[in-house]
Amino acid sequence: MKMREIAEGIYEVILHDKEKEVGEMRVHIVKGKPGKRSLMVDTGFGSQESLEDMEEALRTLDISYKDLDIFLTHKHHDHCGLASTFAKKDAKIFMNPEEERHSYDCLYMQMGEESQKEQKEVLKSVGISEEWTPKLWKRFMELNEWMAKQREPWVYEIQKYPYVALTEGETFSYGDYDFWVISLRGHTYGQRGLYDAKHRIAFTADQVMEGITPIVGTTHANEHLLGLYFQSLSWMKRELGDCLIVPGHGEPIEHVAPVIDQIVYSYLKKMDQVKDAVVKDETPKTVWQTTKLVYGIKEIPEDGEDFIVMKSMISKTFSCLEYLYEQELVQRDYRDGRLYYGKM
């Protein structure tokens, strides 16, 4: 277990992804005053190794589950993988209910009849179906069947957990810190963070990371995620520019402005590629057709982790296409259950 104190009373635990798709995840713990509650920001991967590391960290800090609050920034497997386990141990979990507005999301795995039904509708909307793309459709269905047969949940699969709904502006106080909940839309629709104005420190989940362009994970049309992401980054640059930014992946960031500039530049560059792919001829294209052109996808990945990466590519392309449509740079048409994007 690797743990260090990154600010007075705030500890960081570094966890590693055995599936290697994410690499590492950083969980943060704000230790409460004697006899008071402590806070954990996210839980890490849903693996035995991560559980052992987190339990060792809690023992080292002398924090019991019954005195532990857990703030989930968003509902992705690397951030809430242990939430169901910790809830069973009497930890109290907080999350924005907007993270569950849909039963299926392209960037996480969840079993259940409702989720499977919605998945098929989403896949159809981006141009993936048994009729149009039989090999890719079969791969999605095989993965669902494989997950259903596992005795233990796959690390990407999110187990259900009880939680208390949190709202923007709500205050969480632990130790000498008073955090208020901030909206961080973009990476997901309902992602939230924590900000202490006095100590100038903010937990910002996957909104910004140094050297990495976060995925803006569009799964459903008309959610305006990339536009909301740009608005959020602008707010962060203006209001949190002098803060210590604590992301869920990578080192804390002392000067966030250049990191934000690089992320915006990366997305503008990707949107140029997406727009070029869509308007190169007169034929409107689905999200999947555009993704193949932009990323040069020739074969359907057989490896599970590579398949997850491909899903992220589809989601990012979807975000760019929706933003281009909102800015009236491409046309969008919906027919036969599919979205098509083309020249104005």
Tell what function each PLM region has.
Residues 49-50, 57-172:
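Active-site HxH/HxHxD metal-binding segment of metal-dependent hydrolases
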Residues 9, 30, 42, 74, ...:
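Divalent metal-coordination and catalytic microenvironments
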Residues 40, 45-48, 154-158, 178-271:
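Metallo-beta-lactamase
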Residues 20-22, 164-166, 185-188:
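A short catalytic or substrate-binding loop motif that flags glycine-/basic-rich loops and adjacent residues
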